[in-house]
């Protein structure tokens, strides 16, 4: 039996989120304007606070990586199989669940979001949160892309 590297699962009803969909969309629009100014094709969020701020989902990692991928048109959370469809129910966006059957399925889930014909040239990451190991793996997968620290800009966007 072939086990999947990642999959989607939408079961149950969407939960009431802390903020309205309009609020999350306003936050995303502000972030996308930064992406446009800084020529970023994609952002990989990894911190609990930024994933929650932009998607509504608050994770508990249990030693597994979590992420939220933001492009010009998409926002997708990447979560571990242990959470099943909870991240989809507790966010205003799509979700991809990665499995633990093989190493680095988290990264495979990230690359599944990208159009194969449009590899991102510039990717924003959170240098104040991402581990050195994950940073190296992202650099290997996106070897033709430049990684840019956007952690300070993200923090400013969260300020009222």
Which sequence ranges carry the predicted segments?
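Short internal beta-strands
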Residues: 66-80, 124-126
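Glycine-rich nucleotide phosphate-binding loop and flanking beta-alpha elements
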Residues: 50-52, 84, 131
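Flexible, acidic/His-enriched mid-domain "rim/lid" segments that flank
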Residues: 1-13, 23-28, 104-160
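Compact, glycine/acidic-enriched structural inserts
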Residues: 78-108
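Short, solvent-exposed amphipathic alpha-helical segments in soluble enzyme
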Residues: 59-61, 93-94, 139-142
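Conserved residues at the C-terminal ends of beta-strands
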Residues: 46, 99, 126
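Terminal domain-start leader segments
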Residues: 1-72
């Amino acid at each position: 039996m072939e086990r999947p590297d990642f999959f989607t699962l939408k079961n149950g009803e969407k939960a009431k989120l802390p903020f309205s969909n309009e609020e999350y969309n306003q936050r995303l629009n502000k972030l996308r304007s930064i992406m446009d100014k800084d020529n970023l094709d994609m952002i990989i969020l990894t911190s609990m606070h930024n994933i929650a701020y932009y998607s509504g989902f608050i994770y508990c990692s249990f030693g597994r990586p979590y992420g939220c991928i933001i492009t010009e048109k998409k926002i997708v959370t990447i979560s571990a199989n242990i959470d099943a469809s909870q991240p989809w129910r507790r966010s205003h966006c799509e979700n991809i669940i990665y499995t633990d059957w093989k190493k680095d399925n988290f990264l495979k889930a990230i690359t599944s979001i990208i159009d194969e014909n449009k590899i991102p040239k510039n990717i924003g990451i959170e240098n104040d949160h991402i581990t050195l190991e994950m940073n190296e793996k992202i650099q290997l997968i996106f070897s033709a892309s430049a990684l840019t620290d956007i952690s300070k800009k993200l923090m400013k966007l969260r300020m009222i």
